[in-house]
Amino acid sequence: MIFSKSLAVGVFVVACATPLCAQQGQQLTRPKVEGKVIFGSAVFGEDLEHTLVGGAVRAYVTKRLSIEPEYLYLRRSKDDQDHLVQMNVAYDFTDPTKRFVAYAIGGAGVLHNRGRVSGSDFVTRAPFVREISFTTWTVSAGGGVKIFLTDRLFVSPELRLGREPTVRATINVGYVFGGRR
């Protein structure tokens, strides 16, 4: 909860301190390559909330269609940590040269979990700790809005639903490396 509030305050400060757009008369081109850092929260099932951090690179294949491989590190506690690698496809609903760009995104990938389970034996009541590790598939779909703070720097809140995790809410901070000039 504190992480989410700190993140919101940080994004607000950046938005207020950064000039919003360059000169209005300047013609922008569509983005070609973007990189972003991802911060947020994910929920597995009904109550297993994880904090997440990661990164992604988006490459445009047409004016509005792009592919985006991403990596996320998710952590609930020292006894529950996940690594997620997913290939996404994104579509910009609005003109990608504008200040606000609404998009849909979805993809599939793999999630690897490592953790520890502790308890006591049912019969002997002897305590035990077991290391666990498993890999499973993941899929998610959702949408977001890129808000350009400058010609190239943007923030984008994003919400996704899926399998492993069930719900994912993130704030992305990104930069356009090719295009928008």
Question: For the regions a protein language model found, what residue spans apply to each?
Answer:
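Cleavable N-terminal export/targeting peptides
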Residues: 1-29, 179-181
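Short glycine/proline- and aromatic-enriched beta-strand/turn motifs that initiate or cap beta-hairpins
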Residues: 22-61, 67, 73, 108, ...
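Gram-negative and organellar
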Residues: 24-27, 121-126
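Transmembrane beta-barrel outer-membrane domains
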Residues: 28-30, 46-50, 78-84, 132-138, ...
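Repeated loop/turn-to-beta-strand initiation elements of outer-membrane beta-barrel proteins
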Residues: 33, 63-69, 97-99, 147-155, ...
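Extracellular loop and loop/strand-boundary signature of outer-membrane beta-barrel proteins
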Residues: 40-43, 74-76, 126-131, 158-159
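Subset of outer-membrane beta-barrel
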Residues: 43-47, 51, 96, 116, ...
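Gram-negative (and chloroplast) outer-membrane scaffold detector with strong preference
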Residues: 58-123, 136, 163, 172-173, ...
